[in-house]
Design a protein with these regions (language model features):
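Conserved adenylate-forming
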Residues: 4-25, 121-182
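Surface-exposed loop/turn positions
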Residues: 46-47, 86-88, 114, 171, ...
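Conserved AMP-binding A3 loop
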Residues: 49-73
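Conserved AMP-binding/adenylation subdomain of ANL enzymes
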Residues: 72-89, 96-141, 155-161
Length: 182
């Protein structure tokens, strides 16, 4: 499922990666088509569900195929290990082409049937304290961030001296997505 502008490139990717049965459908075409045209496929747990790309930090970005089993195992394990419930509120501000954003804070939240909030990354990059304000306003309990966001918040030290945030709703904050700097 993709934007119509990317269809040709994604079809080439499927062919070059030898992905059998690879089908790319434009969101616009899906909206126009009668529902009976697009039958839901019968899926095997080992069928590809997502193709995500590495950052390329060690060379060219590489495509990583995640199966339905990979994704659902990760979300079920995370929920069980952390005792997450339907009462959670997740907040994501990272791009959905990152496994943490799409699987951890997207699909897991759907599995939980909990509230999820997604805001553009640029919002937090331009105004880092917006992240804290959103946590407070929506009583967020789960979020994640790479290291650099904590540095951006630290750079707001003067403003933080005059601010007050109630972040007591937070139960789980993951620091991931880049090397830990010391």
């Amino acid at each position: 499922l993709s934007d119509s502008e990317l269809i040709t490139e994604l079809e080439k990717l499927g062919t070059s990666s030898h992905l059998e049965g690879w089908q790319v459908i434009s969101v616009n075409e899906l909206r126009k088509a009668p529902s009976k045209v697009h039958q839901l496929p019968i899926l095997d747990p080992q069928d590809p569900a997502l193709l995500l790309f590495t950052s390329g930090s060690t060379g060219m970005p590489k495509g990583v195929i995640l199966t339905h089993h990979n994704i659902l195992s990760m979300t079920a394990g995370t929920v069980a290990m952390n005792h997450f419930t339907q009462q959670e509120v997740t907040l994501n501000w990272m791009p959905l082409d990152h496994v943490g954003a799409i699987v951890f804070l997207g699909i897991m939240a759907v599995d939980l049937a909990c509230h999820q909030i997604h805001v553009p990354m640029e919002l937090v990059l331009r105004q880092p304290l917006q992240w804290l304000e959103l946590i407070q306003k929506h009583q967020v309990s789960i979020s994640w961030s790479p290291n650099f966001a904590f540095s951006l918040i630290n750079q707001q030290a003067e403003e933080l001296k005059h601010a007050s945030y109630n972040l007591s709703s937070m139960k789980f904050l993951v620091n991931a997505g880049e090397q830990v700097s010391v």
